[in-house]
Amino acid sequence: MLVIHQRLPARSPRWDEELHLTYEARSKSRLRCFAASGEEVGLFLERGQPPLADGDCLEARDGRLVRVVARPERLLHVTCASPLELTRAAYHLGNRHVALQVGDGWLRLLDDYVLKAMLEQLGATVEAIEAPFQPEHGAYGGGHHHSHHGEAEFNYAPRLHQFGVRR
């Protein structure tokens, strides 16, 4: 079994093996899967990190470099007649904590018939496609929780913005 404990800080121009993973699989810190070659792989990554992205590199215990490839999966590709309608669609999806990939004039989310119906009721054009899924990470680290301010275990710093900081 190829055992992987290490995420590399930068992408590498060379690699020895590839892992083709869905978004759900790339979100796990512990995973048993198979490399493109068929070799069994055990991922034991540090918990609390962002999901692996397409092109990320990992180092196996035996020194081999492993490149992550985002496997195509069934998605909903959402477009709208106006930026306002697209913003409304994004708002309603965000209100439901849906993982969302944001592009120039479009949104993508994992296929879900309930969300598809909601988006169509909002006037969006929704097309089912097969593509790699690379959603936004979110503004805060540490995942979803309902902590109280000041509890050290859950007092995560913002990832995208420093609210209230003036320079």
Swiss-Prot record:
InterPro entries: UreE (IPR012406), UreE_C_dom (IPR007864), UreE_N (IPR004029), UreE_N_sf (IPR036118)
GO terms, biological process: protein folding; protein-containing complex assembly; urea metabolic process
Subcellular location as annotated: Cytoplasm
GO cellular component, one term: cytoplasm
Alphabetical list of CDD domains matching this protein: UreE
Pfam families: UreE_C, UreE_N
Keyword Cytoplasm: yes
UniProt entry tagged with the keyword Methyltransferase: no
Signal peptide: none
SUPFAM superfamilies, sorted: Urease metallochaperone UreE, C-terminal domain (SSF69737), Urease metallochaperone UreE, N-terminal domain (SSF69287)
Sample GO molecular function, one term: unfolded protein binding
Sorted UniProt keywords: Chaperone, Cytoplasm, Nickel, Nickel insertion
Family: Belongs to the UreE family.
Cited function: Involved in urease metallocenter assembly. Binds nickel. Probably functions as a nickel donor during metallocenter assembly.
Protein name: Urease accessory protein UreE
